[in-house]
């Protein structure tokens, strides 16, 4: 569920913020287990919530940190896995789930700004596909938030082991991936 992470690692639904001008909001984006499908219950990973909870109520220059767990797994991309897009030889048609998640994050940022949180005090963060989402949002809309924290932004499969990145180098591995899976490779390049 979406809501603010508490110090005790639970999630309190809602967007209640007392004194929004003196808060720093970190929007946390989870990863995705099923890259393009809708799975409502897959958005709270206990180990990640515990890490995020350690930031709650910390202060920077008199401003308290609040961490918002943003559950955005309840919708699918236009070509979900059911349509076999991962094995497609053609480019992805429509919006991928990650593109839609970027849009949802931008909407959430605007809600926080409307409540009174200054843009310069809103930070996007994410793990795994949420980390890639963070990079996508910041590269396309750097003016919308103060910055981002992206960690372990592995998304779209384990290219490192499957394509022997360590042995052949990243360029050769990505070329092999593009040859075997041109549809996903095009999407990866576009994003």
What kind of feature is each model-predicted range?
Residues 16-60:
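Short, surface-exposed "cap/lid" segments of acyl-processing enzymes
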Residues 89-115:
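Alpha/beta-hydrolase active-site loop
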Residues 23-24, 65, 121:
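Alpha/beta-hydrolase fold active-site loops
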